Regions:
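Acetyl-CoA-dependent GNAT
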Residues: 5-84, 89-90, 102-104, 108, ...
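Extreme N-terminal starter segment of soluble prokaryotic enzymes
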Residues: 1-3
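Conserved glycine-rich acetyl-CoA-binding loop
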Residues: 64, 86-103, 107-112, 116-117, ...
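C-terminal "cap" of GNAT-fold acetyltransferases
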Residues: 21-24, 115-151
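Residue-level detector of alpha-helical recognition elements and their boundaries
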Residues: 29, 78, 98, 116-120, ...
Length: 151
């Protein structure tokens, strides 16, 4: 497996992976990443201000994009970045791609000067919840105010 920053040629595939995951879990509803206006062009969004955000993709053994994760400055909490849009193709789940993508995003956030990480998820995403807990995240009483209120 290989990892790199997102490129424009990855946009369509990442959008497909994100939407397929959300559809399968019946989370293709307003307030989720499914309806993010930047979903069709994540590379433009994340690469437009590379000091405050980044998106990394995972490549499978054939070199095809198999998933990704975003990290971006989180407004409202000092020195905080938000882990965003961690989704994998079904063919690579359970193979360590998610854990490695999280490690890459955390390393980027640390090198960019962030001291805290925040993420939002949904209770339907039990595998993701387990990964986040294993990676040291803890549940807070209520989410911060973000556009992804349904997550």
């Amino acid at each position: 497996m290989d990892y790199r920053k997102i490129e424009a040629s990855d946009d369509k595939r990442i959008a497909e992976i994100i939407r397929a995951n959300l559809e399968r879990l019946h989370l293709n509803i307003p307030g989720t990443a499914y309806f993010d206006p930047e979903l069709e062009h994540l590379s433009s969004y994340y690469n437009s201000d590379s000091s405050k955000r980044a998106y990394f993709v995972a490549l499978d053994e054939t070199g095809q994009v198999a998933g990704g994760v975003g990290i971006a400055e989180f407004d409202g909490i000092e020195s905080c970045a938000e882990l965003q849009k961690l989704y994998l193709d079904d063919s690579v789940k359970g193979k360590g791609f998610g854990k490695e993508l999280m490690r890459i995003a955390e390393d980027w956030a640390r090198s960019a000067g962030y001291r805290n990480l925040y993420l939002e998820t949904h209770t339907n995403l039990s595998v993701a919840l387990g990964l986040y807990k294993k990676m040291g995240f803890c549940q807070i009483e209520k989410p911060c105010s973000t556009p992804h209120s349904a997550m």
